[in-house]
């Protein structure tokens, strides 16, 4: 590898399905940067060795995906965001020190800012699900100043665990209490896999949501979930999962290649075409 060419990679197992190379190669071309982005299929038993010798493998940083996100936290110097979410998805060097962060938070908030400017005028949000993605969403909303987050999960204990982690602005509610929480929610976010291709649908009557509410779905296959379609039918603004995927990639690129890229309509169209059934 030429000394002038900087390269990053995606470490996962499996990882071949990822659109990250498409996204980063687009930005490299747009910005005229001599660089590369590869996929490294690394099994769990080889992950620690690979990460601890990332420079030796020719990389200035990496994205991390399933099943390595929690292990990456332990092998690096994590920031506040990675610790809060309990997982790292982006690795980068600070001198010889390998640091980690979680860019899902910036991806979620950046997508909302781009798709529904002014979404944060509402002080109340309703978040569905209490998994890893929910932690990133809750952290981002609290950081942005949302005063009350109703958190619905089928297992109320998992929602209570997030309240214990993030404080009393997070209010756990039973899944059956979602209808009662809708009238006061200026933002509704689905962080579950419900509505994803091959998964059960997410069935919620949105008629009680305020007329100026925003609906966000982290699912991006299909691009327009039933939840988003129902929101659009009511005239509500929406933010889809593909937008979050694109925006979460921005900071990693900046850390590795020293230039902050932009999420453009052209990039979105490129990834949409790649996601389309062949």
Swiss-Prot record:
Keyword annotations from UniProtKB, A to Z: Amino-acid biosynthesis, Aromatic amino acid biosynthesis, NADP, Oxidoreductase
GO MF, one example: NADP binding
Taxonomy, superkingdom: Bacteria
EC number(s) from the headed UniProt entry: 1.1.1.25
UniProt catalytic activity: shikimate + NADP(+) = 3-dehydroshikimate + NADPH + H(+)
Enzyme active site: 69 (proton acceptor)
GO term, biological process aspect, one: amino acid biosynthetic process
Top EC class for this record: oxidoreductase
The protein's name in its UniProt record: Shikimate dehydrogenase (NADP(+))
Species, as recorded: Rhodopseudomonas palustris (strain ATCC BAA-98 / CGA009)
Gene: aroE
